[in-house]
Structure formats: C-alpha cells, structure tokens
C-alpha cells in the first residue's frame, strides 16, 4: 500500500486544494500554474469565471456559496493589507550593530532590531557561538528589547553575516547600521561630553 | 490545543530509547491497526524518534524533524502531515463546504456541519464519543483537521445540535507551521 503524496502549496503551505481558504489565493494560483499546470487547469480551468460556477456546485447552495466567496475575498484583502504593512515596517526598520568596550582591550558586539525581521535570536546566537568560537548570549537592552551579545571584536563579521541572512530572507534593502561605541567613548573622554554620542 | 503554541513552549528535547520506540510503535498500531502495513515506511526501523516535552503536558514525537504524532493524555494523536501520508488508517468524518472556514479558524465543529448534505458520517454503529477523528471537507481529498468526538457519531445524527467535534489540530495552526529547526 503506497503512501499518499499530497501536493503542498509553495505559497501558503496548505494542501493545494485548500488554497482558496488561505487568504493568499491569487499568489497560490500563480504558483500552481507554474508548478503544477495540469492541476491548475483541472481546478481553475482557463477562464476564471467558470471557477466560481464549478465551486458553486457544492451542497451549501448559491446564496451561502456567494457569501462564502465574499468572505474569502475579504480574507484575501485583509491578508494582503497585513503583509504590505509588515513589509513596510520591515523596510523602515533597521538592524543595529553596536560595538561596545568591555574592558580597555576587549569589546563586545550588541545586535538589536532583529525581532522585526523574524530572525530567531536563539538560533543566531548559537550560530555565532560556534562560527566565531566565542561567547554569545541574548539579553534585554535599555529599551527592554532583546539583543544578541557577541563577545569579541567581530563587528565586521557579524555585519557580513546579518547582511547574508537578510538577503536570504529577500530583504536585501534593509539597513544595517554599525555604531562604534567603543571608539566614541575613547574620543568622548577627550573631546565631547558623554551622552552626545547616544543621540545617533 | 496548539492555538498559542510557540517554540518557547518546548521544555526539553530528547531521543527516544529504542526499547521505548518499539513500545510507541506498538501503541500506535494498537490505536490505529491499519497503520500496520505502512508503519515501517513512515517510521523506518532505524529512524530515531525524538520527543519534545512541551508546556501543558503536550508531548511531540518527531521523525526526521517532522512532528508525526503527539500526546496530551494517554492516546497518541497523529499530526496532519502524518494523516496525509496514509489517511485510510484513521476514523474520518466530513464537514460541508460552509464549515471549512470555521474549522481552519480553529473552531469546534457544530453538529449541523456534520449532518448536512455535503457532510459525511459513518453508518451505524459509527464511532464512539472521545474517538480521535480526522476531518475532511466536501469536495476535498485531503484532511484539514484532527479532532475529538464530543458525542458518538450516532448521537451527532440524532441530536444535531451543539458542538460535535472538539478541535485539536488544523491546517495553518502553529503545529502545522512548526519546523524543528
Ligand atoms: Zn496556497
């Protein structure tokens, strides 16, 4: 007895026949057409008008079917709006890498702003710990937001890795800001008053 | 059951010892006898079952990083990914098209959604109360949810009011989207 092989949608991850309920139907259909054209033709035909008629041959009757279609359309609009909002938020946010002095010779790197980009900080800290063979932890900063702390002077390496991670997630345009607080502090001792460097 | 489940709810992860692994498989078979013919394909003899102990006494069992079944009390409950591999093994009911949206939102299933023309219940004697059932939908081939009968299928037909199935796990819930890594 062979195992069943279900086709999961590459967009919404539902079994493809449930895409209409995912709120991402338009993109789901485009995916199906690309990846499983025979199923696309079978389910949605060439003319989209026929689709709703085909689907309307369900037991729940025209009126309820129409209501359902409307609800599903609304779901899709909502989903789209939400995704747009999320994307806008991501694009207007940035990751901040701060180099801080720990002792006179040693420093550490604090990375904040990751939560917006759905980057798993626990995983990232494990990756850094093994990649750079150093101590790495998660702690809360002054704004009570979590940040990843890497021990050692690794700002450049961390920056490169964060860039590659963002690119992997299709968010190449996201800004990564590097602040060298360790250096500034030294300068601060001689030239400016402390506090002014925090403004940046 | 998984409405609010997140990675943070996983307390410990461990490998299941081979003796216990055998017991687990035997238990699965006792509960779902039709799995007999495919069990070694789904959980190969050499596979390592992992156990994730989670908040709320939920235990997830994974093979190759995929949750195959889980446990809250005594019974083993298949994940949808497992059900999809071999749906014949599980007691199944079907809801009408109108109920799909609500099931996917995590609601319990009302009796009329199980007795209307687009729905399907087994013929008498049917399934007992508390049976773990797979939930299919009108005009769909794959299962969309797993639940527990709040009354026997005969009672559902007879009473036809109120909640018939308690929702446990559905397409799109955090268990469905969970990935081990
Ligand atoms: Zn889809």
UniProtKB/Swiss-Prot annotation, chain A:
<dbReference type="InterPro" id="IPR046447">
    <property type="entry name" value="DENR_C"/>
</dbReference>
<comment type="similarity">
    <text>Belongs to the DENR family.</text>
</comment>
<protein>
    <recommendedName>
        <fullName>Translation machinery-associated protein 22</fullName>
    </recommendedName>
</protein>
<keyword id="KW-0689">Ribosomal protein</keyword>
<dbReference type="GO" id="GO:0003729">
    <property type="term" value="F:mRNA binding"/>
</dbReference>
<keyword id="KW-0963">Cytoplasm</keyword>
<dbReference type="GO" id="GO:0005840">
    <property type="term" value="C:ribosome"/>
</dbReference>
<dbReference type="GO" id="GO:0002188">
    <property type="term" value="P:translation reinitiation"/>
</dbReference>
<dbReference type="GO" id="GO:0001731">
    <property type="term" value="P:formation of translation preinitiation complex"/>
</dbReference>
<dbReference type="InterPro" id="IPR036877">
    <property type="entry name" value="SUI1_dom_sf"/>
</dbReference>
<dbReference type="Pfam" id="PF21023">
    <property type="entry name" value="DENR_N"/>
</dbReference>
<feature type="domain" description="SUI1">
    <location>
        <begin position="95"/>
        <end position="166"/>
    </location>
</feature>
<comment type="subunit">
    <text>Interacts with the 40S ribosomal subunit.</text>
</comment>
<dbReference type="InterPro" id="IPR050318">
    <property type="entry name" value="DENR/SUI1_TIF"/>
</dbReference>
<keyword id="KW-0687">Ribonucleoprotein</keyword>
<dbReference type="InterPro" id="IPR001950">
    <property type="entry name" value="SUI1"/>
</dbReference>
<dbReference type="InterPro" id="IPR005873">
    <property type="entry name" value="DENR_eukaryotes"/>
</dbReference>
<dbReference type="GO" id="GO:0005737">
    <property type="term" value="C:cytoplasm"/>
</dbReference>
<dbReference type="GO" id="GO:1990904">
    <property type="term" value="C:ribonucleoprotein complex"/>
</dbReference>
<dbReference type="Pfam" id="PF01253">
    <property type="entry name" value="SUI1"/>
</dbReference>
<dbReference type="GO" id="GO:0003743">
    <property type="term" value="F:translation initiation factor activity"/>
</dbReference>
<dbReference type="InterPro" id="IPR048517">
    <property type="entry name" value="DENR_N"/>
</dbReference>
């Amino acid at each position: 007895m062979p195992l069943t092989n279900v086709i999961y949608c590459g967009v919404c991850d539902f079994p493809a026949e449930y895409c209409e309920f995912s709120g991402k139907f338009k993109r789901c259909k485009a995916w199906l057409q690309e990846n499983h054209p025979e199923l696309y033709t079978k389910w949605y035909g060439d003319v989209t008008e026929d689709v709703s008629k085909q689907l309307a041959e369900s037991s729940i009757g025209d009126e309820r079917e129409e209501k359902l279609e409307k609800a599903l359309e609304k779901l899709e609009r909502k989903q789209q709006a939400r995704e747009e909002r999320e994307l806008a938020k991501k694009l207007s946010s940035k990751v901040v890498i701060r180099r801080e002095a720990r002792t006179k010779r040693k420093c550490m790197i604090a990375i904040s702003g990751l939560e917006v980009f759905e980057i798993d900080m626990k995983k990232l800290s494990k990756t850094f710990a093994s990649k750079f063979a150093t101590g790495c932890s998660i702690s809360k900063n002054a704004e009570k937001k979590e940040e990843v702390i890497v021990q050692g002077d690794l700002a450049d390496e961390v920056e490169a890795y964060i860039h590659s991670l963002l690119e992997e997630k299709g968010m190449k345009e996201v800004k990564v800001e590097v602040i060298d607080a360790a250096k500034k502090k030294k300068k601060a001792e001689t030239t400016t008053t402390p506090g002014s460097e925090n403004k940046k | 059951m998984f409405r609010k489940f997140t990675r943070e709810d996983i307390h410990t992860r461990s490998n299941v010892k081979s003796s216990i692994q055998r017991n687990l498989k035997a238990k699965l078979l006792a509960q779902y006898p039709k799995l007999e013919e495919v069990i070694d394909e789904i959980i190969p003899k050499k596979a390592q079952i992992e156990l994730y102990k989670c908040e709320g006494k939920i235990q997830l069992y994974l093979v190759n990083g995929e949750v195959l079944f889980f446990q809250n009390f005594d019974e083993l409950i298949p994940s949808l990914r497992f059900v999809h591999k071999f749906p014949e093994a599980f007691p199944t009911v079907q809801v009408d098209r109108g109920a799909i949206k609500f099931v996917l939102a995590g609601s319990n299933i009302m009796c009329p959604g199980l007795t209307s023309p687009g729905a399907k219940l087994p013929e008498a004697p049917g399934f007992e109360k508390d049976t773990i059932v797979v939930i299919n939908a009108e005009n769909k081939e794959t299962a969309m949810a797993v639940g527990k009968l709040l009354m026997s299928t005969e009672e559902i037909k007879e009473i036809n009011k109120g909640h018939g199935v308690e929702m446990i796990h559905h397409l799109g819930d955090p268990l469905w989207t969970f990935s081990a890594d």
